[in-house]
Amino acid sequence: MNTPDVKHLPLKIIHDLAHPADIQPAVYRQQVTDTLRDLRARGFGGVVTNVSTQHNYLESDREWALLAVLADACTAEGMRLWIYDERGYPSGGAGGMTLRDYPDGEAKGVVCIT
């Protein structure tokens, strides 16, 4: 059997790659690379993840930098990366940040007219 191209392989959902708040980027890079290689060996073509929800979600420059480390590692390993917001459902709320300055923008319901 031929090995499918990475674009046809499934992505593994990982709700932020957990790490201690004081992790050094080089250590994180090695952990991420090891995780990606393990996933690739198990038939995954990449990951679906988000900025860590553990440490000042979406407002931490450090967390964005660590997400960039993951993105660079995915590129280096030839794997795909999907990024989404995740801190409560429904998705899109960004942990309350979406509506922080505009609470009237919240959807009140969903209607299907056929």
Regions found by a protein language model. Give the residues of each.
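Structural recognition of the beta-strand scaffold that forms the well-ordered cores
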Residues: 11-15, 46-49, 81-83
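Active-site beta-loop-alpha junctions enriched in small/polar residues
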Residues: 14-20, 52-54, 86-89
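Conserved, charged catalytic cores of large soluble enzymes
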Residues: 7, 41-55
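A generic structural signal for short coil/turn motifs at secondary-structure boundaries
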Residues: 22-24, 55-59
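Mature extracytoplasmic enzyme cores
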Residues: 1, 9, 28-42, 59-114
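Boundary/entry segment of secreted carbohydrate-active catalytic domains
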Residues: 1-25
